[in-house]
Amino acid sequence: MSINFLSIPRNRFKAIGVLSVTCILIYVILHSSIITTDFDVSDYGDKFIPSIIFDDNNDNGENLKDPQPELDNDKGNGETDTTTSNSMTTAHTFWKGIFDTFDKYKMDLGQDPENAVSYVDKLKQKQGPLNKEVLLSKAIVSSELMKHLKEKHSGVVEDLPSVMPGSVYNKGSKGVVIIGGGKFSWLAYLALVQLRNVGSKLPVEIVMPSRADYEKELEFCENTLPEMQASCVVLPDVLGEAVMKNRKFASYQFKALALVVTSFEHILLLDSDNMIVSNPDEIFESKLYHQYGMITWPDYWKRTISPLFYDVAEIEVNENKRVRYNRFPLYNAPNVRSNIYTDQEREEVPFHDLQGSIAELSTESGQLIINKHTHGKTILLALYYNFYGPNLFYKLFSLGEQGEGDKDTFVAAAVVTRQDYYQVKSFIKTFGYADSDDKFQGVSMGQRNPLIDRKHYEDHVLALLEKDSFKSSSIADQIEQMKKFENEDFDQHNSIPLFTVHCNYPKLDPKLYMSRDDLYDEKEKKLKYRLYGNLKYTKEVVKDGETGTEASTDKVQIDFELQQWQHMQDILCLKKIYFTHFIDNDMNELCQFIENQVAWLSKSQN
């Protein structure tokens, strides 16, 4: 049957046209509706939001045992697909399989999930060294829930792929990843400027948690960042429609998600308020990185991971053998199965000094270096832990002590997957100021250069372990020697250069400073204190040589606090780069404050 369109009356032709357009619009709307969250990233990094982690009924029971063989077109040689479109489709398929696996092993925490892991009143907890009994006294988990957790955990560890396919990262690529969006785009850019200032050539990806974040900062992503060899990565675009449909992510999951969506194979993950003060580029070429594939840094506190987690994860801990003091190893002959013989000795030994446990100290995740190829399963399992963080794993990893959050999920995942990591041995150096009551207020954490820390550790600690005199000494004598290392060579005042300064409280934000009556001098339009004291770091500066001579390198001392304010002045007041974070601010007033601060710090830097 044929239709002669010329014979159709004009009014009917118009009706057909309108109907056709309407049908097309309905089709487009139905097939492009991805439910995403307009994320409130204002809470990122400050606290987590105790909310429902999953809003996803897509529990179809599908299991992705190991998607790599069918997803990776290169059959394992790490090359990406021939076209961007095919590569993205392949990556989306992989991530759908991963999240289907997460859904299959969804933790059921009962009708009262917030109390599935129930903290015990501190007055009722056992006191003393953090041995097994003391740790177990801090929280209660029912035997029924323990059985459920063990089954689900065993299943997800079994079903997650051992490696990620080449379609989800660019083979051989190295770079820095920072989370942006809202105020964190401002902080991320300040961190980017500092990174370039210390000489780093690494590309940078700033992760936008939602498409709304990206669209609000289109100018920032498309024009400002490329000038600094940086770009935006939009999280839902990388994961794909099938993953994002009906699924919501919370702020405490963004750090693990950033590792997932970055295109880099070799990753330095930075909190947006973390300032690099030592060029990180050489780390990816180092023996340390190639040996371990993952580098972490310590937090202030000792590990309080519950022995129950070791049961859930089926990690065997030898309760009769002490193998370390704090984060420093002790010598034990290879054939010695036990060196703890009495109940009194057992009570005196911290649980995390035992063979099979995770070594001290707890981990501070403001910076993390990791290889996406060798440690892909660690990243995936850490993401799983963060899905059930606030009500489950954060509690099992902290037991109500300070520092609860995502920080220990990465090391725990590495131990479960049996993938190596090196944790820096040097203790955090705290920077701050004395307030009007002469009370010290900490504002930032200084972490040490991992390469020099490792060299220091090899030259002092590991070298001592090779000496026959040390091998023949008692455990008690060995501990005394390790205490000296702890208090002298690796304490917060050691000589190992800084790597980062984590400016987490308060953050480097002039808008925030002006709202703080305890910090801001309204009359003088400047801060009342030098917040970072006399913090200086060493920077190498290349000097042009005279005619016929080679350029030389000088080492200069940089006033950290003054430099950050100079960066703010350049970004906001001279270049006038736009940030949505300051949309409601009078920029003239803000820049007057910044100008006053630069002038005041310049006079007081000596």
From Swiss-Prot:
Cellular component, GO annotation: Golgi apparatus; Golgi membrane
Parts of the chain on the Cytoplasmic side: 1-14
The EC number(s) this enzyme carries: 2.4.1.-
Membrane topology, Extracellular segments: 36-606
Gene null: resulting phenotype: Leads to hypersensitivity to toxic ergosterol analog, amphotericin B, calcofluor white, and to thermosensitivity.
Entry-linked Pfam families: Mannosyl_trans3
Subcellular location: Golgi apparatus membrane
Main location as per UniProt: Golgi
Residue segments, region Disordered: 59-86
GO biological process: mannan biosynthetic process; protein mannosylation
Official protein name in the record: Alpha-1,2-mannosyltransferase MNN23
Protein source organism: Candida albicans (strain SC5314 / ATCC MYA-2876)
